[in-house]
């Protein structure tokens, strides 16, 4: 979706927003604060090189969710101390094809579980074959991209992953 033109992104975001509303699912837009505002998304997720969370909060208001990607204990603690950050992304845990970033490994995940009283999502290279290690370290939320969209059956893969969390 990052390579699509803005009009197409807005159109798709509106369609996704409606699907989410109908199904009671929170809709977070990645990177694009303007699109999140246009489609009345529930929030926006930003990276370390994107707009600062304080500036995002000024734009989207107090009732929207702000997520921030973090890649180190220092970034995690800074996000934890910022009242404008509602949750963080912790990762990439493992090597991933969706980002050109050095994996942080399970150590940062363990740190987040023990030291950051802030909701977080473990992300990066998480697959069905390694998700048990993520769960064992205490992660309660995960983000998987290629494992799901590349699956022969997205619904079967999602169900399989959900079962691992329900054990």
Question: Model-derived features: where do they sit?
Answer:
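Glycine-rich phosphate-binding active-site loops on the catalytic face of alpha/beta enzymes
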Residues: 48-58, 89-100, 128-164
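Catalytic cores of alpha/beta
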Residues: 27-42, 71-84, 115-121, 126-144, ...
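Glycine-rich, small/polar surface segments that engage phosphate groups of diverse ligands
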Residues: 26, 31-37, 41-57, 63-67
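Short, catalytically relevant binding-site loops at active-site mouths
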Residues: 5, 34-35, 51, 73-75, ...
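Glycine/Thr-rich beta-alpha phosphate-binding loop at enzyme active sites
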Residues: 39-41, 46, 65-114
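Small/polar loops that bind or transfer phosphate-bearing groups
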Residues: 1, 48, 68, 122-123, ...
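Alpha-helix-loop-beta-strand connector modules within alpha/beta enzyme cores
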Residues: 10-28, 56-71, 101-128, 161-167
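Glycine-rich, proline-tolerant flexible connector loops at the mouths of alpha/beta enzymes
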Residues: 1-9, 92-99
